[in-house]
């Protein structure tokens, strides 16, 4: 009986060619698994059938949109996760979910080998293979695009020589990855850091000047860190992301032009569109400013960068990431309330906050009548707070 390879299938050129290549080079049967993460574009049934037409013995589509929103996007919101303080992990958080479903498919379809279509220069090869190792260390992994140094030209030539039914073009300038959390664009003329993105780079967002005279104001409600309503209308996490993608995207919000440090040691330029993600993280951060005690908030902000780095580096299933999740979940117990935001000209402006768990005390904060802050206590506090610095200064100055 032939081995079975379970392939993470995108429907694009590389993974379509991989189906035929794996069969020819290894004699194995290929089971193609496509994961719907809300990426839009082609109908998933078309993608499923394409895999069969390319030679897969079975082709499966998994609707993972709600799972992605609830179990991957929501923890990212809770962690205010922005890699290098900018990137909301658009692609990075999707890979562990894909890994999970590929492993499940391997178990249910008799697969002993798993495969992906990643190159050897990017982060995704690491995310996939480290994930496979964490969930199913017994499975073998093959990566034809990386291991045989496929170029787009080689893949197109193989497709033409083997009559693989996929429309391809050498003129497509960009590499694009997208899901409901956002969209990532790279390569082409963007590899020159001085080149400004052109209009055709963007899809999830409009030019920030298009709706200049029609700004949008909205209220996002959270319950223990989870977005539960927009303008008073109950929403699921998926619905919140989808609605904010449309509304914030219409205002040009969520465009990011980033030079980032890849795990493999190189710097790369990426253009991201993440309107819903950026609005939700901004609103969530602001609610935490209102509801988290100072020392807890300070420590959480330090931890957030490490959480982001772990996820970016493909360590979603690591013991440290698991431990940090426990900490983050604890911090969310009182992150309940409403944040009002103004979206305009590509910018997000918070202009209102309210929470039953607020630590903001008006009587302590006000400078007007009703001030309950005992200013007489401040003199001694300042003296004690600066005492160690004062002692050191006297020593250094010889006083």
UniProtKB/Swiss-Prot annotation:
Chain residues that bind L-citrulline: 87, 123, 127, 175, 260, 272
Top enzyme category: ligase
Binding site for L-aspartate: 119, 123-124
InterPro entries tied to this protein: Arginosuc_syn_C, Arginosuc_syn_N, Arginosuc_synth, Arginosuc_synth_CS, Arginosuc_synth_type_1_subfam, AS_cat/multimer_dom_body, Rossmann-like_a/b/a_fold
This enzyme's EC code(s): 6.3.4.5
Subcellular localization: Cytoplasm
Pfam families on file: Arginosuc_syn_C, Arginosuc_synth
UniProt similarity note: Belongs to the argininosuccinate synthase family. Type 1 subfamily.
Name of the protein described by the UniProt record: Argininosuccinate synthase
Source species: Rhodococcus erythropolis (strain PR4 / NBRC 100887)
């Amino acid at each position: 009986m032939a081995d079975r390879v379970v392939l993470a299938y995108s429907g694009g050129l590389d993974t379509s060619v991989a189906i035929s290549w794996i069969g020819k080079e290894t004699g194995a049967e290929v089971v193609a698994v496509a994961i719907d993460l809300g990426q839009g574009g082609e109908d998933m049934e078309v993608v499923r059938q394409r895999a069969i037409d390319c030679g897969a013995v079975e082709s499966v589509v998994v609707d993972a949109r709600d799972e992605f929103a609830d179990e991957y996007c929501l923890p990212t919101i809770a962690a205010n996760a922005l890699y290098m303080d900018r990137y909301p992990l658009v692609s990075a958080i999707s890979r562990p979910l894909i890994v999970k479903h590929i492993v499940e498919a391997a178990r249910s379809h008799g697969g002993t080998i798993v495969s992906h279509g990643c190159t050897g220069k990017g982060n995704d090869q690491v995310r996939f293979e480290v994930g496979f190792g964490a969930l199913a260390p017994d499975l073998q992994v093959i990566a034809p695009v990386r291991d045989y140094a496929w170029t787009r030209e080689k893949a197109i030539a193989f497709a033409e020589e083997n009559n693989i039914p996929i429309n391809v073009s050498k003129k497509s300038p960009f590499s694009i990855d997208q899901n409901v959390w956002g969209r990532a664009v790279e390569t082409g003329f963007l590899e020159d850091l001085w080149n400004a993105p052109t209009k055709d780079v963007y899809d999830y967002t409009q030019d920030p000047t298009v709706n200049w005279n029609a700004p949008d104001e909205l209220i996002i409600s959270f319950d223990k860190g989870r977005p539960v309503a927009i303008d008073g209308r109950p929403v699921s996490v998926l619905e919140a992301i989808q609605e904010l993608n449309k509304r914030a995207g219409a205002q040009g919000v969520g465009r990011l032009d980033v030079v980032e440090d890849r795990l493999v040691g190189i710097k790369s330029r990426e253009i991201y569109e993440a309107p819903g993600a950026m609005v939700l993280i901004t609103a969530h951060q602001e609610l935490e400013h209102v509801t988290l005690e100072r020392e807890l908030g300070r420590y959480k902000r330090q931890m957030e960068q490490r959480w982001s780095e772990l996820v970016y580096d493909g360590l979603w299933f690591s013991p440290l990431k698991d431990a940090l999740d426990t900490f983050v979940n604890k911090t969310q117990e009182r992150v309940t309330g409403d944040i009002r935001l103004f979206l305009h000209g590509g910018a997000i402006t918070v202009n209102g906050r309210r929470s039953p768990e607020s630590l903001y005390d008006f009587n302590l904060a006000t400078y007007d009548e009703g001030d309950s802050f005992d200013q007489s206590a401040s003199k001694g506090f300042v003296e004690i707070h600066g005492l160690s610095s004062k002692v050191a200064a006297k020593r250094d100055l010889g006083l």
